[in-house]
Structure formats: structure tokens, C-alpha cells
């Protein structure tokens, strides 16, 4: 298992030097953030990114992510050209020795929270999702602004894309995902790249949009779309656990049994009323996930891929990108590494 850390490039207040000082840290999870969605990532740009990371004594473990254009998700006629571009990006990454790509198939919005700075009694702040608040939000009126979302939509564009998705139900979205997978995975497999689809976050419909990568049944359906290790998942335990109907340990075990876990996100959350939740510190006692059992499964099934501490709180007065500060994620990384060492030594 390779400990890794998300880095958002030159604009990230967390530097590669900062990350390299975290004990057990080996890899970087990053992307090229200024290439418009749907365009090819050139080998030159990939080489530049790789050289910068390696100059800091680290390696690129995973690309997170190569975004999937909305026209692909909507099944529009333009999707074939966009998929061709996606395939070329996969090939270019493979040519530079990068073999794992995380992506998602969430319509319009990436991960969704209703508050980016909920304050805990100890003064730390965290991301939370309040189901009641979410039902009162209207994305068309610009009430939503979260990291990871495409802020380039005007009000008119947002209305148009939301209207377009009104014609797309879950089965149609599955159909469009299947089309994408059957084009992408043979090409990824041929160049030794493992794709790792990220679950919907949270894993249920929001704002009337369909969401399909939501739990155990979805994973079992997904892996059957194309039978290949290259057609794998990102086991984001915090995302799956944010639906109280999901048993995250059952999901994790089954995903490992299927041999489709290509990347792991370690994040803890504390379930609230209904489908509300708060992101917490990583240790098990602070959330609803038994992180020790998750790491035991990683060891039991011989997982050798990258794992990263996912969203962290803002602590010790740190400011920056919500969920992606240095300090709490560094604590999370060392906590997970400690669990892993304990599991290994305890199994002998």
C-alpha cells in the first residue's frame, strides 16, 4: 500500500515540500487543472508535471482526475470525439509511466456539501452535508459554490444543463456510462492503465439529478460492464458511508473480493439525522467508520495501490482550500500508516 497525498498544483497553498515532510509519504495525487474538459492532455504538459513532482522526491501515484465531459454523460452526438480525446489522454499518461486514473460520472456537480466551514466545539472546521439545507438550495440561482465544481457555468448555462438532465434518468445514465466504459477500458487495458471510478458523493440523488455509483449493488453492476482489472473503482469509504443504508465494510470486502479496488480514499464521517453527515477527524472514535477494519481489509487482500487521506478538517488556524489543508490530512496519513503497521505486525 502506497501512501499518497492530493496536490492541486502551483495554486495549492500546500507545497510539494510540505507534503514530502509527512512520514511514510511516497506519492502525489494530482491533475492538470488548466486544460479545458474534453481536450487532450499533451505529453509535454504531463512531463512538466511529472518532473516537478519528482524534483520534490515524490512520484505521481494517481491522476485525479481526468474529468468526463458532460456531453459524454448526456450521450450527445459529440461524445465520440470527446471519448477519442479522453483515450488519447489515457495513452499519453501511460507513456509517461502513470498507470492509475481516478474519475467520476456525477452529472454537473462533483462532491457536494452545504457548509464548507462547520465549526466543531474545539474550534476546528469541517465540511458537512445537511439534507434539509440541500433541499432548499437552487443551483440555477447560483446558491452553490464549492471546490471541485465547474464554476464556469453562467446562470443561463446552468439552467440549460439542468434542463438537459431532466431527460436523463438513472437507467439512461447507466446506458451512457456503459458506452463510455466499453470505449475506454479496452484502450486503458492495452496500455496498462487502471481506471478507478469514484462513487457519487453523497451517493444519492441531489437537485433531481440521477446518481448511479452509490453502493454495493452499483459496484457489482459496474464491474460487469467490462470484465477487466482496468475497469475498477476508487474505494472512497467516506463517500459510501455517507448513505446510512450502506455498510461500508461489506462494500469494501466485496470490492476487494472482486479485485477491482484500484485506489483508496481514507476519510471518516459522522452520520447525523436522515442523510446528513459531518466530516470528522480520521480516527475511528470520531466518526461512523471503523478505519482499523478498513485497513485490515487492505492488508488481507494484498492491496498494493495508492491510498490517500481524503478531506481533512481545518485545524491550528490553517486557512486554504476547504477539506484540503495540510495539517489534518497529514495527521490522517500518519494515522492510516500507523494502522497499517499495526495490522501487518499483528497478523504475523
From Swiss-Prot:
The alphabetized UniProt keywords are: Iron, Lyase, Manganese
EC category: lyase
Pathway per the UniProt entry? Carbohydrate metabolism; pentose and glucuronate interconversion
From the UniProt record, list the reaction(s) this protein catalyses. D-mannonate = 2-dehydro-3-deoxy-D-gluconate + H2O
Q: Which GO terms describe its molecular function?
A: ferrous iron binding; manganese ion binding; mannonate dehydratase activity
The cofactors named for this UniProt entry are: Fe(2+); Mn(2+)
In terms of Pfam families, this protein maps to: UxuA
- Please identify the protein, giving its name as recorded: Mannonate dehydratase
Q: Which organism is it from?
A: Streptococcus agalactiae serotype V (strain ATCC BAA-611 / 2603 V/R)
